[in-house]
């Protein structure tokens, strides 16, 4: 069975000082995917970073909240994490096992941190992974602008030699066909 992961799409990641590439487009595509997954009775899983007072994402604080533009339904699952890897010391793998999930479709923020780490972790745990090419975002970095970072990671993932399980990088429109 399949599941959609939506990683760290939280208010604290989308402040004016942390501008993300194509935020509204990314949100729209994630919402379209979420609706399609729900229609097909596949789980939609929000991964939410729990931070500390020293950084942002303190549970209960405004920065920690999922973006209100994302459509969330009562049956959606939310899993908290404290590290870049959504599997590290979380209930994600247990939840996926309970629901017989073998294929993950991954979206979210930030491409070069939590999204990348979670993709690689999922592969090492023998999940089939589909990265949504236009369903993840990041900010510009000191040596690369955000579109270059996103393009680089899409290229990297598409060219990886994963475990015996598959890794694909696919545009939203190709999933929604």
What are these regions (language model features)?
Residues 2-8:
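Short, hydrophobic/glycine-enriched beta-strand segments
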Residues 54:
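Phosphate-coordination/substrate-recognition cap region in phosphate-metabolizing enzymes
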Residues 18-46:
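A short alpha/beta connector and helix-capping loop motif
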Residues 12-16:
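Short acidic, Gly/Ser-rich segments with clustered Asp/Glu that frequently serve as metal-coordination loops
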Residues 3, 32-35, 57-177:
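Active-site-adjacent betaalpha module
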